[in-house]
Amino acid sequence: MNEVITRFQESLYESKLHFSVKPILIGGMAMEYYGMRKSGADIDLIITDEDYKNLAMQYPEKKKDLFGDLGLVIDNFEIWRSIAHLDYNFYKKEAMEEDEVFIISIDRLLWSRVCAMEVEKYRNDLMLMKEYYYKIYTNQEFHEEARLHEKSYEKIKGPIFGGKYED
C-alpha cells in the first residue's frame, strides 16, 4: 500500500473522523502520492456538503470561512466543502480511488495550483508538476530522435528548416 494512504488512514483513525462519502485528498499529500514532493504535516480534504454540515455541528469551534469556502480544521486535517466555490463533484472527476479516500486527479491538482499561482509555494508546485508531466508523458521515441540533433539545436538556437542539421 502507498505510504501516503497508510499515513492518511492512521491519521483518520486517530482523529476518529467519519465521513458518509469518501473524502478527496488534495494539496501536499496528493503531490506526494504522485511522487512530486513530500507533504507537510497537514492533510487537506474536500468533502460533501452533507459531511461538512455533520462535522460543523459536531465541531462548531473548528469552523473556518475563507471568502465563502467553508471548512474545518480538526487535528492535522484541513477539511473543505469547496475551494474557489467548486464542490466535491468538481474535484472528484477522474480522481484515483483508494480504500478510504479518493486522490484528486493530476489534472484537477494542476488546475488547483494554477488558480493559486500568485503564492510562491504553488508556483514551485507548478514547476514540479511540469516536470512530472514531462517524465510521465514524453514520447520517448520522439525524444531520442531529437537527441540525435542536440548540437544543431544548440548552435542554431531556433527552428531547423529542410532537414539541414549541423551535427
How should each PLM-predicted stretch be described?
Residues M1-D167:
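Compositionally biased terminal segments of proteins
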